Amino acid sequence: MSNVLKGKPVADKISEGLIQEVEVLKEKGITPKLAILRVGARGDDLAYEKGALSRCAKIGIDTEVKEFPEDITQEDFIEALRKTNGDPSIHGILIFRPLPKQLNEDVIKYEIAAEKDIDCLSPINAAKLLEGDDTGFPPCTPMAVIEILKHYEVQMEGKKAVVLGRSMVVGKPAALLLLKENATVTICHSRTKELSSVTKEGDILVAAIGKDRFVKEDFIKEGAVVIDVGINVDAEGNMYGDVDFEGCKEKAGMITPVPAGVGSVTTSILAKHVLKACRLQHNIY
């Protein structure tokens, strides 16, 4: 039986410091606030939103959810985003992705205010991530992956890390952050040939492909550390990851569960980024 890497101890440790930070800000008359912009009501978005709202409430961060219909026009969405950008009471903005087809993310990503873009949608923050510039905001989920590995004292330096998925939301940023920790990184995707033979080389496997229980036992190396980023919700509301947890837990050395794994840490990173944005906007360093 592998060592199950629960997210709660990691999230709680991060949150402890954030609670104290919020208290200091409130003494200065500043209340950090997060705005969530959600189009439609996808199950994985709602699950993440619920966790984010709960985490922010515990820490003392105000929140506002702006829900839009699935068929909202790009013009209307951009107008709402610009209003949110210009609201001085809002310090962080989270836009759930992927957006519906009528909303062009390649246009919208240039509209979000970089200083409020706490999940790395803006090309400015993406460039800072690539440069290793800590003044930006890396995506929350890949940062949660790194925090889990550090918390459980998993050595990254010199290890082979395989990232399954190449999105700008998780896959590519996770690879860059692992590279920053001096891991040797391979990115796999839908066109990778002999996929399982590549993933089996990883001392660390990060699954971020967005397919319910896609990663089976034959995908992983004996004793590997498996980090499951997936959130997949079925018709009955049951949540599963991208990894077949039951099938892989005996072979893996360490493995994160879904739920109660990466997601809970992601919300703490989100809160951390809201506070960072708030401090920067108020010139508190």
Curated annotation (Swiss-Prot):
GO terms for cellular component: cytosol. This is Bifunctional protein FolD. Belongs to the tetrahydrofolate dehydrogenase/cyclohydrolase family. Keywords: Amino-acid biosynthesis, Histidine biosynthesis, Hydrolase, Methionine biosynthesis, Multifunctional enzyme, NADP, One-carbon metabolism, Oxidoreductase, Purine biosynthesis. Homodimer. It comes from the Bacteria. Gene3D superfamilies: Leucine Dehydrogenase, chain A, domain 1, NAD(P)-binding Rossmann-like Domain. It comes from Alkaliphilus oremlandii (strain OhILAs). GO terms for molecular function: methenyltetrahydrofolate cyclohydrolase activity; methylenetetrahydrofolate dehydrogenase (NADP+) activity. Its EC number is 1.5.1.5, 3.5.4.9.
